[in-house]
Amino acid sequence: MSAIAIIDFGSQFTQLIARQVRGMGVYCEIFPSNISFETISKFNGFILSGGPQSVNDDCSETSRVVHEIIKLNEATSVPILGICYGQQLICHYFGAKVKESFKQEFGRTKIKILKESPIVKDTWDVNSEVDVLMNHADSVDTIPQGFTVIASGVINQTIAMIVNEQRKIYCTQFHPEVKPTTNGSKLLSNFLDIANCKRDWTMKSFIEEQKEKIKNVVGEKKVIAAVSGGVDSSVAAALTHKAIGKQLNCIFIDTGLLRKNQTIAMLKEIPINYVDKSNLFLSRLKGITDPEEKRKIIGNTFIEVFEEEAKKIGDVDFLMQGTIYSDVVESGHASDNTSTIKSHHNVGGLPEKMNLKLVEPLRYLFKDEVRLLGKEIGLSDEIIFQHPFPGPGLAVRIISEVDKEKVQILQEVDEIYINTMKNYDLYDKIWQAFAVLLPIKTVGVMGDGRTYGYVCALRAVTSSDGMTADAFPFEDKDQHLLVFWDFLRNVGSIIVNNVPGVNRVVYDITSKPPATIEWE
């Protein structure tokens, strides 16, 4: 089976490279930058990710793996693709000058294609201007010997893409793995062709591989699982159950922070124990306003409850979680070099000395892959295609302190928002939609009286993997916008007229980046 090694230097987008490669039917693995060369020496090609460092700083460990990969390339012509910091590392190795950019570039920009190359075959035409995503403070200032400039920045004349065709080394300052880059996936596909990769990796093969891994790790021991009714925990539970059957014990904990009338979607043949701990969670959140502290309290309490329930079951050694890769990336656990954006319920806030070992069968899958997996193992569309819901629940959608009254207000708003969205046939067009209760009150008028109520923010985004997202709607189609505008006016009116305590509704139009999808 063909395989690509992705060397992770700490980019927030590294996992998107893997998602793109796997989506093209090629197996790939992600390795930290301190990986031993023996581990990666047999791969068909190498992709060097971006990262937050500068090649002008001390990076001896980083340089080691790059030097070894380039030496392998010299001996075997194994293809290399360097992205952003990866480009800078390659250029630095060959003696080119990399310096801090006169004007740093973060976000969408345009590049101009200057020459043809196999890496841009059927991707972009020569002399065309292309939208790409840049995310760099440093840039390449001189061209290494043997390399040719294929593209440059339209505004800043950044060296955007260089190649050494003889050595099969390709470098981009921009990020082809991120959707704002037009046709970036085709560039990656061209690299896989250059590396002679067969497109033979499938979700079915991943499922069989994970089942075997779960069996080998767990053996004959019992596993306790957190299930919330959401996509991730449901798919993880179903996959684990297929691997070990009755050894899996699923528990649904009511934290008091769920959607109104939220119930666990039926998972056939998997028994589920229900535990109400809403008073415990709400009491521990009293007086807490910092979002990270909320997450850690919820994470600690969650594990504490599971440990208590595990004792009741007896002889439990493992805790299964529905952690997916976007959780890991945003928490800074994918690489030692990755900056933490925010901790996630499934990967942050865990006690340092946890009495249960972790089983995370979805840890290296993105949301769209999780849905494909769920479909493959026979879960219903009701489970698979529901919108994501955060592990900490409404606690991270109530800005500032959480209490029972605020939870009830937000539950009412959320129910109206989602149900009205479904009535407008918009729900399935949107990746994630939710309401946020803000920590401010504003003056309003209802009837002949003055009101002083909460402001509620509505959010709806489109995405495929949760790593980047656009506010919905993102297309300038008049009819599309008119329908959504009518929906917003209608749902805002319904909310303020039916939810006591709320007198103003606003809509969040921010994309990711620079914002995250959730507010906290």
From Swiss-Prot:
Swiss-Prot/TrEMBL keywords: ATP-binding, Glutamine amidotransferase, GMP biosynthesis, Ligase, Nucleotide-binding, Purine biosynthesis
Binding site for ATP: 228-234
Coiled coil: none
Residue ranges of every copy of the Glutamine amidotransferase type-1 domain listed in the record: 3-200
Reactions that this protein is recorded to catalyse: XMP + L-glutamine + ATP + H2O = GMP + L-glutamate + AMP + diphosphate + 2 H(+)
Gene Ontology CC annotation, any one: cytosol
E.C. number: 6.3.5.2
Catalytic residues in the record: 84 (nucleophile), 175, 177
Domain of life according to the entry: Bacteria
Domain (GMPS ATP-PPase) ranges: 201-386
Pathway field: Purine metabolism; GMP biosynthesis; GMP from XMP (L-Gln route): step 1/1
CDD domains assigned to the protein according to its UniProt record, in alphabetical order: GATase1_GMP_Synthase (cd01742), GMP_synthase_C (cd01997)
Entry function: Catalyzes the synthesis of GMP from XMP.
Subunit structure: Homodimer.
Protein name, as recorded: GMP synthase [glutamine-hydrolyzing]
